[in-house]
Amino acid sequence: MPCLLPPTQVPEAPSISANNGVLFSSFALLFMFFNSLAISLGSKELYRSSRSCTICSSLIPCRTLIFSLWIDFASDSGASVLVCCFSASLPLVFFFWALFSLSLSFQDDIFLGLYNSGNPVPQLLVLRVPLSLLSTESDVSFSTISPSKSITMVAE
């Protein structure tokens, strides 16, 4: 009697979203490493700029040279508001975004809520990431919700 074996299953090739998720998570880990390294150096140049946030109206010093240059470069645009308020939380956003894009690739959207405890005004950063972002035709929405003001930034 011939031995009937079940058909072998060919493993699926990794999807584009999984590859990009690994890329984003490795970028976030490297970014957090350099962020902590810059904080530990404690150079006065890294703490030289301090701007008033338009959302929480508090002075927040730049913690890294990367964010300092970004705020100086984008001081007249809406990106400086995001960097000013959430400079410490931004690498974590990218890291968790990468983890969720790896594990929840079947979902339509990913919602992340981060409570910013560094500001006197309670605020919530909501990052809405469509998974079609991995193509070039979608956008990312950053919504900041506070008791007094709210701002929505859309980057295409």
Curated annotation (Swiss-Prot):
<keyword id="KW-0472">Membrane</keyword>
<keyword id="KW-1133">Transmembrane helix</keyword>
<keyword id="KW-0812">Transmembrane</keyword>
<dbReference type="GO" id="GO:0016020">
    <property type="term" value="C:membrane"/>
</dbReference>
<feature type="transmembrane region" description="Helical">
    <location>
        <begin position="54"/>
        <end position="74"/>
    </location>
</feature>
<feature type="transmembrane region" description="Helical">
    <location>
        <begin position="80"/>
        <end position="100"/>
    </location>
</feature>
<feature type="transmembrane region" description="Helical">
    <location>
        <begin position="21"/>
        <end position="41"/>
    </location>
</feature>
<protein>
    <recommendedName>
        <fullName>Putative uncharacterized protein YDR526C</fullName>
    </recommendedName>
</protein>
